[in-house]
Amino acid sequence: MNKILISILVTAFLVISNLATSTTVLAGDPGPPKEKEWKGKGEKIEFQSMPILTIKDFLNGVVPEKRNTIWGTLNFPANAPDKNVPVVVLLHGMGGIHESAEFWLSALKSMGLATFMVDSNWGRKKCKKDSNLKKDIKWCAAANRGMNRVIDGYVALELLSNHPRIDPKRIGCLGNSLGARGCLYLNVKRFQNMWGTP
C-alpha cells in the first residue's frame, strides 16, 4: 500500500512541477536566441527569395516587388563523384542553425549525400525595418510561423536541380521545427502551383 501511495505522490509531484515549469518558461519567453550568421564549411550560394510576407499574401500567392537575398551552403562528401550526387536541403527552425544541424550535416555526409544548409533568418534579420509587419510580429524569425521556409525550399530545389554535380531526381529535404513544416509543405500542390517552379 505504501508503494502505491508513494507512486501516486511522485507522479502528482512530477505533473505539477512540469506544469509549473512550462508556465514559467512561457511567461518569461525572451524569444529566439540572438541571431548570428552561420559560417559552415562548403560553398556559400546566394539566391533571391521572398521577404517576410503576411500569411494572407502567402496563401493568396501575392508576389511582392522586392526580394531578399538569402543563401545556403553546399557541401559535398570528400569521395563524391563529379556528377549525379544526391543532395539533402536542410531547413532550420525559428532560432536559426544550431548544433543539431551540424549533427545532420555530418550524418548525411557520411552516407555519401551532399547537403545544402539554407540560412532563412540572417538575410531577413531586419524585417521590421524593411516591411509593414512591425506591429504584427515580435521576432522576424517567427513571422508567419516559418511559411517563408516553403518558398526558400522551392528556390533551393530549383537552384540545385540545375547544379552540374547534383542529380536533379535525387533531391530531398530535412527540417527541424519550422523547417520541418517547410519541408512538409513543399509537397502541397497548391503551394507548388503558387510558389514552385513548374
Language-model-detected regions and their locations in the chain:
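Bacterial N-terminal signal peptides that target proteins for export
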Residues: 1-9
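C-terminal segment of classical bacterial N-terminal signal peptides
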Residues: 14-24
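N-terminal cap/lid segment of alpha/beta-hydrolase-fold proteins
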Residues: 28-83
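Primarily recognizes the serine-hydrolase "nucleophile elbow" in alpha/beta-hydrolase
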Residues: 60, 145-198
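Cap/lid segment of the alpha/beta-hydrolase catalytic domain
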Residues: 95, 99-100, 107-110, 119-150, ...
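Hydrophobic residues in well-ordered beta-strands that form the structural core
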Residues: 117-118, 175
